[in-house]
């Protein structure tokens, strides 16, 4: 089995997106992430899908059963079988990350994570979404997390950009300024 990274993973992701209905991608990605998680946690399952000691027919059978149980479309089953036969199914996690990134790009969306010390009220969540939409020029999908160590305020990560408006972050900046003199 060969690892799949970078341009090769992106190529497979583009192939996948050309096979499926773009509106089904979020649901399919969610189910593929389940497969990736199983491959990471269950060594026997991973070996069955990736080891050359198992015949292609055996792997195709397992993939077919898995796709049926997860309710994955026929195109996805064919794609997983293709990856298995190519010997690159071990790189499914990286491929799924590219599928998700290319989907968001095609839909002109970005994903972000908002971390706060306490649960945020809906009106604040809406203001954050509107502000990020104005900054990025794209629709924003946010995931919310709670981290009491922030003390107050929020930390927002969108793509590779971090906006730290937390008290903890501001205290860190103040500390750095005091140290530098």
UniProtKB/Swiss-Prot annotation:
An MF annotation (GO) of this entry: proton-transporting ATP synthase activity, rotational mechanism
Keyword tags: ATP synthesis, Cell inner membrane, Cell membrane, CF(1), Hydrogen ion transport, Ion transport, Membrane, Transport
GO biological process: proton motive force-driven ATP synthesis
Keyword Nucleus: no
Any Pfam family the entry gives: OSCP
Record's signal peptide: none
Keyword Glycoprotein: no
PANTHER family, A to Z: ATP SYNTHASE DELTA CHAIN (PTHR11910)
Function statement: F(1)F(0) ATP synthase produces ATP from ADP in the presence of a proton or sodium gradient. F-type ATPases consist of two structural domains, F(1) containing the extramembraneous catalytic core and F(0) containing the membrane proton channel, linked together by a central stalk and a peripheral stalk. During catalysis, ATP synthesis in the catalytic domain of F(1) is coupled via a rotary mechanism of the central stalk subunits to proton translocation.
Record's subunit section: F-type ATPases have 2 components, F(1) - the catalytic core - and F(0) - the membrane proton channel. F(1) has five subunits: alpha(3), beta(3), gamma(1), delta(1), epsilon(1). F(0) has three main subunits: a(1), b(2) and c(10-14). The alpha and beta chains form an alternating ring which encloses part of the gamma chain. F(1) is attached to F(0) by a central stalk formed by the gamma and epsilon chains, while a peripheral stalk is formed by the delta and b chains.
Family: Belongs to the ATPase delta chain family.
Descriptive protein name: ATP synthase subunit delta
Origin species: Thermodesulfovibrio yellowstonii (strain ATCC 51303 / DSM 11347 / YP87)
Gene designation: atpH
């Amino acid at each position: 089995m060969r690892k799949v990274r970078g341009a090769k993973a992106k190529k497979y992701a583009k192939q996948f997106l050309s096979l499926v209905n773009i509106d089904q991608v979020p649901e399919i990605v969610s189910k593929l992430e389940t497969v990736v998680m199983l491959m990471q946690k269950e060594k026997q399952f991973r070996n069955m899908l990736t080891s050359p000691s198992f015949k292609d027919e055996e792997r195709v059978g397992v993939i077919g059963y898995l796709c049926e149980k997860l309710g994955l479309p026929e195109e996805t089953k064919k794609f997983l079988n293709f990856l298995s036969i190519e010997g690159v199914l071990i790189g499914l996690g990286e491929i799924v990350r590219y599928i998700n990134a290319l989907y968001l790009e095609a839909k002109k969306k970005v994903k972000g994570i908002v971390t706060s010390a306490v649960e945020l009220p809906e009106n604040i969540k809406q203001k954050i979404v509107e502000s990020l939409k104005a900054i990025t020029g794209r629709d924003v999908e946010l995931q919310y997390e709670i981290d009491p160590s922030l003390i107050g305020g929020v930390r927002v990560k969108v793509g590779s950009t971090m906006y730290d408006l937390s008290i903890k972050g501001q205290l860190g900046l103040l500390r750095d300024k005091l140290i530098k003199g």
